[in-house]
């Protein structure tokens, strides 16, 4: 196996991929308009998608997309907001905190259970703290409720308690804890 990280660009020939989730597959491979959402997001500068491909097997192992985000006081539980704000000097407290969002993260069925998702999150923690590429303090994710336990095992915390009928839960990881570990 020769895994390689590749920045997706429109027109790139994506190797076969199936994570058994139609929405996550569709983001990368197809939509009703026949243009993948990853393609649209790249053209409109909304998100950047990265592929991890096995160059020997010529298949996509996993992919993830990242985009700029912010944690806003108005949408955050007061307890969570206070927990975030206490970690910063008073002079730097504000009504929002800069973050980078993991817009999508999917691992091919063949590679699930082999720590690829965990490795991607570890890579992102390192990537956004090494030379501080975007000036973000947090990584956020709208995690599917079925994936909440996975993100918690990677030290993400719930930012907003979801309603019973919500499909996702807003979670965050404080990059400062990665820097100081």
Predicted segment positions?
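Conserved beta-hairpin
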Residues: 45-65, 78
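Conserved acyl-donor/pantetheine-binding loop and adjacent beta-alpha core of acyl/acetyltransferases
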Residues: 63-104
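A short, internal acetyl-CoA/4′-phosphopantetheine-binding micro-motif in the GNAT/acyltransferase core
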Residues: 103-113
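Conserved acetyl-CoA-binding loop-helix of GNAT-fold acetyltransferases
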Residues: 113-127
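Conserved GNAT acetyl-CoA-binding A-motif
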Residues: 121, 128-143
């Amino acid at each position: 196996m020769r895994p390689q990280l590749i920045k997706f660009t429109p027109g790139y020939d994506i190797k076969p991929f199936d994570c058994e989730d139609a929405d996550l597959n569709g983001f990368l491979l197809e939509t009703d308009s026949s243009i993948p959402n990853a393609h649209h997001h790249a053209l409109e500068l909304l998100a950047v998608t990265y592929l991890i491909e096995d160059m020997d097997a010529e298949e996509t192992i996993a992919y993830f997309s990242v985009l700029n985000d912010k944690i806003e006081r108005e949408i955050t539980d007061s307890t969570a907001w206070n927990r975030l704000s206490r970690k910063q000097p008073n002079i730097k407290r504000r009504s929002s905190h800069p973050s980078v969002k993991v817009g999508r993260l999917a691992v091919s069925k063949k590679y699930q259970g082999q720590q690829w998702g965990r490795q991607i999150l570890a890579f992102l923690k390192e990537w956004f703290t090494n030379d501080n590429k975007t000036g973000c303090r947090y990584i956020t994710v709208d995690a599917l409720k079925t994936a909440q336990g996975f993100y918690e095992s990677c030290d993400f915390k719930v930012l907003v308690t979801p309603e019973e009928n919500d499909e996702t839960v807003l979670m965050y990881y404080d990059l400062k804890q990665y820097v100081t570990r």
